[in-house]
Amino acid sequence: MDASTLFKKVKVKRVLGSLEQQIDDITTDSRTAREGSIFVASVGYTVDSHKFCQNVADQGCKLVVVNKEQSLPANVTQVVVPDTLRVASILAHTLYDYPSHQLVTFGVTGTNGKTSIATMIHLIQRKLQKNSAYLGTNGFQINETKTKGANTTPETVSLTKKIKEAVDAGAESMTLEVSSHGLVLGRLRGVEFDVAIFSNLTQDHLDFHGTMEAYGHAKSLLFSQLGEDLSKEKYVVLNNDDSFSEYLRTVTPYEVFSYGIDEEAQFMAKNIQESLQGVSFDFVTPFGTYPVKSPYVGKFNISNIMAAMIAVWSKGTSLETIIKAVENLEPVEGRLEVLDPSLPIDLIIDYAHTADGMNKLIDAVQPFVKQKLIFLVGMAGERDLTKTPEMGRVACRADYVIFTPDNPANDDPKMLTAELAKGATHQNYIEFDDRAEGIKHAIDIAEPGDTVVLASKGREPYQIMPGHIKVPHRDDLIGLEAAYKKFGGGPVDQ
């Protein structure tokens, strides 16, 4: 596409050079800029990428978007704008032909449950033989092909490229995990959503948002800004068991479908039965009551299942068809995932990293603990420490607790575990500044019949260490290796 055409919708301060050049790529990553690319520089929290403009020029890039004029060769066109990232969104959606308009787009937000609900929607679509894509904490997936990702919600250009990739692969729908960071930072500008789903709101990310009010406002942006295509039917799915849903009703102009277990809602779960093999319940709807069975464990997953079913139903699939699909869904990686049921202990990994998430996790597993519940939890570095003692208190619902760091980054691991220990309500806990050693200790003290829960990371494949270096780490692999060494079995499948 000709650059002059691309910039027709952009208000610029000035253009230094010519826009008469062909463009086939947009990037905010200086390492990928080349001839035919537009490089969009920005001032980030830690890095100002304007300093890489000379690098991209050396790589053959002939057009940069900047917030102030740079010292560059005369053959490099500079487009000076007030807000480079807002312009990046406009350019990306224009160049890639507004990809979110070309499929059904589901957006899932909330403190806990985003990954589970988003994955369930994707898996239901696949059971219905529909081409589907997913993007979130567990990476990027088109049908069954997976690649890893860095952020729950990528920056705006990368996000648009992923949606375009899904469209080109024939995806009929795409489900996005929508983070509060992504909403505030404008990463979702220009994305056309068809259905927005809310799970819950509890304390998290106050290191970024400052207050719960600001955090809640960030979440609400999804529901007030579903897009500009008024010809499409759009819906909002809210959890009535969370009081924040009342506020979300006031900010959205779209039709709302509510679900709940404890509070009255349009769609409800009654007569709940739970086991470590899954859940069953009566799904009470405006159209009748349906029996539902699912392999997912825990009462909180019933809420997630309802949210996913309603979202898919809202776009025209019958509930009977969806319920049949739900019976045979694959596990959501790293979410209340039981590792190797042949072991004499129940070894479980989960992503729960807030007090609310941990409470729900313990509620789910405690009824099925045969002997002791051993619970390992970590606290992330450079994050909101005000929530940490409460996490420690909740963890002490278990018989024995292990406190570790989780992505300590530049914080002292001993400080992080000490913050968790401030909330301890009994003395049956131990602190490890090395998470891997903490996991090995959990297995070492476990006896047949015990339940070992490794919380806060799920299948996250790294630890963020000093200097923000990512070191390979997998809770599931470390736990299984230690369990096979003690109890026999294996080998660990890498």
UniProtKB/Swiss-Prot annotation:
Claim: Lipid metabolism is one of the keywords in the record: no
Post-translation changes: Carboxylation is probably crucial for Mg(2+) binding and, consequently, for the gamma-phosphate positioning of ATP.
Keywords: ATP-binding, Cell cycle, Cell division, Cell shape, Cell wall biogenesis/degradation, Cytoplasm, Ligase, Nucleotide-binding, Peptidoglycan synthesis
Organism field: Staphylococcus aureus (strain Mu3 / ATCC 700698)
Gene Ontology annotations of biological process type: cell division; cell wall organization; peptidoglycan biosynthetic process; regulation of cell shape
N6-carboxylysine found at: 219
Protein name, UniProt field: UDP-N-acetylmuramoyl-L-alanyl-D-glutamate--L-lysine ligase
Gene name linked to the record: murE
Similarity section: Belongs to the MurCDEF family. MurE subfamily.
